[in-house]
């Protein structure tokens, strides 16, 4: 009897060998990363100056890394003032160059990395601020040079204080454009140095971005440490 009890205590299933367990854990981790990046959120790096001073980026420097929430817009629509990441419509992609290697082996590895979220996707993703939504009319200048939406000036405290006006004279003197339902008019905070909706008014969407192209809402800057913080979505129609 006593020997039987000892056998019951000492008998059990052995764990998997390390050479099976470790690859299995890696696969599980990659699946979890894929699920998170696909349905919950993703980290992006800012490549240009178009969203200064809200988001820092420039050619040849290390731009802000931002966390993009993919859940919020499953339960609601983007609102004026939101900073969003979106996939560029066709007219926005002219001149876009693939970020994948010409080497087929490396390219395949990059594609796999893109699927699981450890390598940027090979698509022209952009970050801008929603200025007007479906049914609103955007364009024209107020007496003090502010942008008009539905004839009223926006309250835009986030704008770059010293925009390079000589590089982009269309800060508010365009349109007016009535945004199609389900689409969004987007612009950079660095209004004088941003190739945004204003530059695509001749396309099929009149420069707007379709809802299905919206990837998510920018919630926070996570790197560098000196710039960690949330990215606000002010009520820009309050003016």
Task: Kindly give the residue locations of the regions a language model identified.
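Soluble "head" domains of membrane/secretory-pathway proteins
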Residues: 2-23, 35, 39-45, 53-239
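Hydrophobic alpha-helical transmembrane segments of multi-pass integral membrane proteins
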Residues: 27-35
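A short acidic/basic microdomain associated with nuclease active sites
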Residues: 48
